[in-house]
């Protein structure tokens, strides 16, 4: 089985530049709590209707200079991920 979470920004580049559309709060994941958008306590429901922590979490980003994602886990937040970015910026022309 596989479960996917995702986000998308349409980038048609009408002026030849990457869109300035933000994802999430417009801040990169590495800016962390208080800046970047996040999901925490990510869980799935198994066939017995029990909440379980997801296994084998992975990430995929096409243009990490424009938008990115980072996963982690700890005792307070369980499994979490930070995501987002500003879109067009000096490293994402």
Where are these regions (language model features)?
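Exposed, interaction-prone regions of secreted/extracellular proteins
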Residues: 1-93
């Amino acid at each position: 089985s596989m479960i996917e979470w995702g986000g998308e920004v349409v980038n048609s580049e009408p002026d030849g530049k990457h869109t300035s559309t933000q994802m999430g709060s417009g801040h990169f994941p590495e800016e962390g709590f208080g800046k970047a958008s996040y999901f925490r306590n990510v869980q799935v429901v198994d066939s017995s209707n029990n909440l379980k922590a997801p296994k084998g979490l992975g990430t995929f980003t096409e243009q990490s200079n424009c938008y990115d994602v980072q996963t982690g886990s700890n005792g307070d937040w369980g499994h979490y991920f930070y995501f987002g970015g500003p879109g067009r910026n000096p490293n994402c022309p």
